[in-house]
Amino acid sequence: MPNITNNHTFNIVQLSDLHLTGDIGQAPSYQRFLAVFQTAKHLNPDLWLLTGDLVNDGNSDAYDWLFNQLQATKIPYLAVAGNHDVTHEIGIHLAHQERIHVPILPDRRLKNCFRYTFQAGHDWQILLLNSSVSGEIFGLLTHETLLWLDQTLTTHFEQTIIALHHHPTKVSSDWIDAHLLKNHQDFWHVIKKHAHVHTILCGHVHQVHTLHPLPAHQVQLLSCPSTDRQFMPFVDNFQIADTPAGCRMIQIDNKGIVSSYIQIVQNTHSFCLNNAN
């Protein structure tokens, strides 16, 4: 179990919605990721946490490239699937409702029903859930996954962070809220029973949100910017936002106090130009 010493924090860097596609290591999505990743390395992470939509077309070579980048840092990493990791989207130049979605198998290195523990003032656990559905954009947690979550929280009382791809609460954007976690009420029914759930991390929305969905519960829901492109928040129809890529830092000090901030990277476009050879 990783542990922190006095006057240090346990630092989790959340990376999400990479959408790696095109020439491996060279295409713009790779270069934008590398710009964010190089910045994130200087944040002294103790864990890389990737919350889905890593690769756009299921290319195993793209996953190999990504996981080689992570392994080279010698820092532990965890990753869950997003809808694009289990769905090949054909016709990306078309309107969303006109695209064809073909089911694909997830990479075997993506986690589901996985428990990771560390110490930071108190004992902590991170629970990874697969919310992706092959051939679909929306999310769903299977009965077996919800049962595992409930049983794990019942038998392990560590302070808990849960990571999944799909947002389990609406974010006031109609088009992306149509593709949230479909059985979110079942998910929250489990969470309500367990006061030691502290933070839920998600991707999918390409937006930054801090929400408190359960007024009588301490739990906070944090979403993460994409390392690729951002979606315009608080609009009913799909729009790309002219805002920087980035990642989320979650810090837990030796008193068990959690803080978080967004690290943005302004020069991803310049990074693409400088490395597109």
From Swiss-Prot:
Positions of disulphide bridges: none
Q: Any note on cofactor binding?
A: Binds 2 Fe(2+) ions per subunit.
* Cofactor(s) for this UniProt protein: Fe(2+)
Q: Where does Fe cation 1 bind?
A: 17, 19, 53, 206
Binding of Fe cation 2, residues: 53, 83, 165, 204
**InterPro entries noted in UniProt:** Calcineurin-like_PHP_ApaH, CNP_phosphodiesterase-III, Metallo-depent_PP-like
Record-linked Gene3D superfamilies: 3.60.21.10
EC number, UniProt record = 3.1.4.-
**Is Ligase one of the keywords?**
no
Where does this protein hold AMP? 19, 53, 83-84, 206
Give GO terms: molecular function aspect only: 3',5'-cyclic-AMP phosphodiesterase activity; metal ion binding; nucleotide binding
EC supergroup of this enzyme: hydrolase
Q: Does the keyword Iron apply?
A: yes
Q: Which family does it belong to?
A: Belongs to the cyclic nucleotide phosphodiesterase class-III family.
Name the record gives this protein: Probable cyclic nucleotide phosphodiesterase MCR_0369
| Organism, as annotated | Moraxella catarrhalis (strain BBH18)
